[in-house]
Amino acid sequence: MAGHSKWANIKRQKARVDAVKGKVFAKVSRQIIVAARSGADPAGNFQLRTAIEKAKTVGIPNDNIERAIAKGSGQLNDGSQLEEIRYEGYGAGGIAIIIEALTDNRNRTAADLRSAFTKNGGNLGETGCVSWMFDQKGVVSITGSYDEDELLEASVEGEAEYYEVIAEDDFQGVEVFTETTNLENLSQVLQEKGFDISEVEFRWVSAHTIEVSDPEQARSLLKLMDALDDLDDVQNITANFDIANKLLKTLAS
């Protein structure tokens, strides 16, 4: 949608801030720990391989990566056990929000999330209350120059569903979408065709996006997203709203 910044693009901006804060190290390390449960060899574990590549991209030292793999695969036992949990809730104006968390204490995480929602005009709901508004997809992000005919051909070969050209200040490239079960195949095909892949991920994609034009609602939503993202147990946040770039700049000033 021209002139608008989708939540995925807002998340990219936040990711850069998180990287400066060092917060991204902890989140990616946790992804490695969970992925390594299915096997410590990245050659046979696509989820682990993807997490390791992301860790290297953000500059996590190899020693930290190896330690996370050892912890996840059971070679290093510190007594803690991370659990993957999905939470769902509503922001100001009924905006749907999905939170993916990794936690060793689900009671603590639920309490922290409930507090963040309550303080920022939202409420934590029951599992399933908003996830029906989203589909989970596999997404391959491509940066750099590309030939669109070659991209279309590779997307068909890799069994992609569709792709979107992204032209934002913080990201110039293409996002290619597929079924989650086909993500490994698609990323491999695109890599073999020589495309510059910046990220491979699973993402919740909303069927219908709500445009937020009211400044107070937008401010409340962004404060809620920040509060949720600041929680150590939170790995990923997805919401079904857009905010016009002009309004975003006004709120940031």
UniProtKB/Swiss-Prot annotation:
GO BP terms: regulation of DNA-templated transcription
UniProt entry keywords in alphabetical sequence: Cytoplasm, DNA-binding, Transcription, Transcription regulation
Entry's Gene Ontology molecular function annotations: DNA binding
Signal peptide: none
Main location: cytoplasm
Keyword match DNA-binding: yes
Family: Belongs to the TACO1 family.
PANTHER family given in the database record: TRANSCRIPTIONAL REGULATORY PROTEIN YEBC-RELATED, TRANSLATIONAL ACTIVATOR OF CYTOCHROME C OXIDASE 1
Protein name (Swiss-Prot/TrEMBL): Probable transcriptional regulatory protein Tery_2125
Lineage: Bacteria, Bacillati, Cyanobacteriota, Cyanophyceae, Oscillatoriophycideae
